[in-house]
UniProtKB/Swiss-Prot annotation:
InterPro entries: MHC_I-like_Ag-recog_sf (IPR037055), MHC_I/II-like_Ag-recog (IPR011162). The lineage of its organism: Eukaryota, Metazoa, Chordata, Craniata, Vertebrata. It is a lipid-anchor; GPI-anchor. Ligand for the KLRK1 immunosurveillance receptor. Binding to KLRK1 stimulates cell lysis in vitro. It comes from the Eukaryota. GO terms for molecular function: natural killer cell lectin-like receptor binding. This is Histocompatibility antigen 60c.
């Protein structure tokens, strides 16, 4: 009965809010990601329980690559502060955005689902044109839609809805449905739940 309650609790959770606060410096990525307010991944502290390099190596590599691209696009040597906010339902990306703080007063918002860019101040359009980059947009989209989703599905039971098989890093051009495979037992569990209830 306890197992059934655990499965029911996991299934009803369904929607997850994943937020990250990252700091990008020259060849350095630091910060934390949380799911529904609980710390999930730690970028930079190798001894932390949520070490991103160990929990989600493909995600960590993707974010490291993106941070290097962002660093090359900025003018100056100030650290970039990046905030990501995204929502997932049963492991699938619903919506989200990246807020790239280019200096103390200006931010650029990237909405990868509808491929739009927006700036916090309209007087800073030259900065946005400098940042608007199709490869960066594609990489951000891939991280939100594939890498974060895979990491949520294969990580701690506190955050996933259903058991999943181990996943491999998804190729950028690979369809989302192929990126993370569900366990063949997912359907059986749902049938069992319906039968019991």
């Amino acid at each position: 009965m306890a197992l059934l309650l655990l499965i029911l609790e996991s299934c009803s959770a369904g929607t997850y809010a994943l937020n990250c606060k990252l700091t990008v410096k020259y060849r350095t990525l630091q910060g934390l990601c949380s799911v529904n307010g609980k710390t999930f991944l730690d970028f930079g502290d190798e001894n932390h329980e949520g070490n991103a390099t160990m929990l989600c190596p493909a995600l960590y590599q993707s974010l490291t690559d993106i941070s290097e691209v962002m660093w090359s696009l900025q003018s100056g040597n100030d650290a970039l502060n990046v905030t990501t906010r995204s929502q997932y339902y049963q492991g699938e990306f619903i919506d989200g955005f990246w807020d790239i703080n280019t200096d103390e007063q200006h931010s650029i918002y990237v909405y990868p689902l509808n491929k739009t860019w927006r700036e916090s101040h309209s007087d800073n359009s030259s900065a946005m044109e400098q940042w608007k980059n199709k490869n960066l947009e594609k990489d951000i989209r891939n991280v939100l839609m594939v890498d974060f989703s895979c990491c949520l599905n294969k990580s701690s039971p506190h955050f996933r809805e259903m058991p999943t098989l181990p996943t491999t890093a998804a190729h950028v051009d690979q369809p989302r449905s192929m990126a993370c495979k569900s366990s063949p037992f997912d359907g059986l569990i749902m049938i069992l739940l319906i039968y019991i209830l």
